[in-house]
Amino acid sequence: MIQFTCKPKCFLGLLIIAIIQLLPAKSFAVVQPVTAASQLVKRLLPQYVGRFKFEQIKTTNDSDTFELESKGNKIVIRGNNANSMAVGLNHYLKYYCYVSVSWYKNNKIYVPSELPVITEKVTQTARCNSRFMLNYCTFGYTMPWWKWDDWQRFIDWMALNGINMPLAITGQEAVWYNVWKKFGLSDAQIRGFFTGPAFLPWHRMANIDHWDGPLPMSWIKGQMLLQQKIVARERELGMKPVLPAFAGHIPEALKAKYPSAKINSLGEWGGFPAKYRSNFLDPFDPLFNKIQKEFLAEQTRLFGTDHIYGTDPFNEVTPPSWEPAYLASVSKTIYNSMAASDPQAKWLQMSWIFYFQRDNWTNPRIEAFLKAVPQDKMILLDYYCDNTEVWKMTDKFFGQPYLWCYLGNFGSNTMLTGNLNVVEDRMENAFKNGGKNMWGIGSTLEGFGVNPVVIEYVFEKAWENGPVNTDKWINDWAVRRRGKPDKNTEEAWGILNKKVLMQYGALGQSPLTNARPSLTGHGDWDTDNKIEYDNRNLLKVWGLLNEPSTGVLPDVYRYDVVNIGRQTLGNYFTVVRDRFADAYNKHNLAAMNKNGEEMMQIIHDMDALLATNSSFLLGKWINDARAMGGNEAEKQYFEHDARLILATWGQEGSELTDYANRNLSGMLNDYYGKRWAMFIADVTTAVKTNKAFDQKAFDKKSNAFEWNWSQKWDVFPAAPKGDSMQVSRALYKKYAAEIAQ
């Protein structure tokens, strides 16, 4: 592993440390809702600033509500807060202007030159007032290299979609840096405790320490300043950022400073060696409350507070004891430590732990853990409702408030998944039968992936006062992806809804192109290529999207064309691999050569298609990482971190290898493609020498290749190349007949 050691001039290093520690408390200016909504229009639709008028209204029961109507030449949008006004703006853009606003800053927004008139006043009230977004992992799989302009667009997107409880964990290392300094730790001990940037989510969840560290001081300072902008903008737009609290995770170096403290190792995680294991301070130790007090005070000084704190003890690790009384004492003590510093504190807890270790987290243990916290002071995220609804298994979380959440993506994998009809049925049932303590909804996606349709559906559902016809909804979605009514686009999305979007997002999904090569199956557990639909239906969708009506094609439409095309080809790759394996079993070298060449051609063609869109570029991921560095040493460190999480994740041969696999131009040709080329060559050599192919020997060889790739410095294009429609049509023509068989 590359060990980055920051060696700035002594004066500069001390100056940065001093700046962080001595910064005055951050004051966050209050922006009036009407002003915030007007500024939203100025950012997204600057040419139409004078055409929108916002007004604030009062509502009964503080329900989030918006109203729309035309008055003269203005579109009047009313709401009880800036968030509701933003949802009203989005409703107008979606259903009157046929506009789909993407969460990516590179996607332009196309609005008609003449704004459509609202012929009849529109009023909508949210079915729930709590709408959560993000996952600790998203900050590693999607967001680690984001700068302010990326965040600004995403926060605007969240406001448009009514999200008002975003997870906000950027920059917390600056808080911890100051806190651990107060407890006697050195700069080297603190920065060495942190992981590399892309791995910080798992450090924050107390899964691993040190991995790919130490963390540069420039990163800590830069992320602190970024977080101040993030939470300020989120609050402007009517959101309550969810900040972290202390859950017991401490640096091992603290043992020497406090030898009598009750500190335990949390045990193995992800196959990492013992030296990377996290340490847990017993909540009953007097030191726990002292650390909590210092942390919350310092965090509030730097970032303010909305009194909602995300704290997740025992995430994917085993507690020191499974006794219900112990678990109850832990949760009670953690909550009390928060409340002692902030009497208004509410604890947001993800219920993933109850799903992940469901054999251990029995109902008596869950009930003890939850009921030890005062009623309504703990909010549960029912984390993975697209798979398992924990509220149904726990008597509605034994009365504590919870949010129904759609996960949908792991590792930012690029697999076409998500079933709108199942989501509709489950959400509607939760609204009707989930109890009064079902406070709202959310999305807990690990990475953005390639299925924005389901995410936007989930948040729009929060504003529907009853069942939704998914056929009609998907048709409206199709219209705004195209920018206008279009027969082919609407038919394509209708097929997707009825015949393709069948399976939920699951752990470790990918086209076979991304998998560790093998003659059967799909390599490792985290690269499952199984699909529950006929690829010929997806081929038909691809063909329809390749032939839209004339006129400007929005960026989101071109994204869809690339997305559907690369998945269709990825599915077909499995067919050709199986032909190659069959030829191997028959010792048919001619057929092996033919199918091996076609396998490599599919990978190259997928790479060429992906290269036409900025959302599918390895070069952009790496360039964004390098841009975080202030000198060449830092740039190389950040690039290494960015490569590592996509490849081995952990050490050479790690069980997490390819967990964050994704279809990206550059990854296909240079990483997955070269691995498949090695495989094809080795299998062919085995037949030529009349030997059986040795999968174990190849896996060992593959381990070395994967690790070496993460240490390289190749340059990849960071800007798209080629026209998406032209490349897509050419590839459809090339492969359609074969796939259709």
Regions picked out by a protein language model, each given a short descriptive name:
Residues 33-37, 85-89, 150-154, 226, ...:
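Stable alpha-helical elements in mature extracytoplasmic
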Residues 128-147, 158:
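Active-site-adjacent substrate/metal-binding segments within catalytic domains
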Residues 524-741:
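Histidine-centered catalytic/metal-binding microenvironments
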Residues 28-128:
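Contiguous, structured surface segment used for ligand recognition
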Residues 12-22:
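Bacterial N-terminal signal peptides
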Residues 74-79, 140-144, 217-218, 322:
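Second-shell loop/turn segments in exported
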Residues 49, 100, 106-115, 134-138, ...:
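Catalytic-core regions of glycoside hydrolase
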